[in-house]
Design a protein with these regions (language model features):
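Glycine- and acidic-residue-biased ligand/ion/polar-headgroup-sensing regions
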Residues: 62, 73-86, 102-103
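Short phosphate-coordinating micro-motif centered on Lys-Gly-acidic
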Residues: 65-70
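Polybasic "coupling" helices that flank or enter modular domains
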Residues: 142, 146-212
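Short aromatic/basic micro-patch
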Residues: 75, 99, 131, 203, ...
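Cyclic-nucleotide recognition modules
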Residues: 47, 98-161
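Phosphate-/nucleic-acid-contacting segments
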Residues: 175, 186-254
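Cyclic nucleotide-binding regulatory module and flanking cytosolic helices
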Residues: 2-61, 105, 110-112
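Cytochrome P450 core scaffold surrounding the K-helix E-X-X-R motif
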Residues: 86-92
Length: 254
């Protein structure tokens, strides 16, 4: 292992799943995707113990991992890919609670509390996940103290994310303000400078965006067209380029 990279060069490359076209890492110790999230930075002995209680699977996009209201069978670690958490009303209206990137954990709060899952978790891209049964995770966290810190950090991040969304949806005066807030957040999180502005990936449909900001798909389509016509941004198939950041900021009431 080199001091510079921290990468073990003896690690075998992941095998490729030809069905979904993504790589698979069966064991955490061999993982090439390690990030500073949850279990990724544990010592080798802890990772080995964790591997012994997990089940690795690969899922296509639009796979429901668990549904809102179900009893918590266990938690999922999103090794690669992406997922979304949605909540629904009795009338069938759906709101996207959060977009979950690779490296995060799904179902943690319900597994700890024993209460039903508070949202539906669904993959939005081909994804590798590790599943841990609830009773196995509870025992594992009791046996490995270092797990407790990461559990607390994950729960804090979830609370902050929920609070930010409530603020964006609950305090915004219009759909235009909510959309502007969302686009600026995406730009801040993953924007990269380009010749004409800040470019950031958008892997969501107008329907998905509408479910994130609590409005209709038609409203999202109309607002994005208005932003394009005013040359505030350019929309490509899987990305947007923000040209006039200040004009979006002006839509947000302090």
């Amino acid at each position: 292992m080199t001091a510079k990279s921290g990468i073990n060069k003896s690690i075998k490359p992941p095998r490729t799943n030809t069905r979904y076209g993504i790589d698979i890492c069966d064991h955490c110790q061999d993982c090439l995707w390690r990030t500073d999230n949850f279990f990724c930075q544990f010592d080798p002995d802890t990772l080995k113990a964790f591997d012994s209680i997990t089940f690795t699977n690969v899922y296509p996009a639009e796979t429901v991992l668990y549904a809102e209201g179900e009893a918590p069978r266990g938690l999922f670690i999103l090794c690669s890919g992406a997922a979304k958490l949605t909540i629904s009303s009795g009338t069938g209206k759906t709101l996207i609670k959060r977009i979950v990137p690779a490296g995060e954990v799904l179902g943690l709060s319900s597994v700890l509390s024993g209460n039903a899952y508070k949202a539906t978790a669904e993959t939005t891209a081909p994804s590798q996940l590790k599943f841990v049964k609830r009773e196995d995770f509870i025992r594992f966290s009791e046996e490995h103290r270092e797990v407790s810190f990461n559990v607390a950090r994950q729960l804090i991040e979830e609370c902050e994310s929920d609070a930010n969304q409530i603020r964006a949806l609950g305090l915004a005066n219009s759909a235009a303000e909510r959309l502007a807030t969302l686009l600026l957040a995406w730009c801040e999180e993953s924007g990269r400078p380009s010749a004409s502005g800040m470019r950031f990936p958008v892997a969501m449909t107008h329907e998905d965006i509408s479910q994130m900001i609590g409005t209709s798909r038609e409203t999202v389509t109309r607002l994005l067209k208005s932003f394009r016509d005013k040359k505030i941004l350019t929309v490509r198939r899987s990305s947007m380029t923000l040209h006039k950041k200040s004009e979006l900021e002006d839509l947000i009431v302090p």
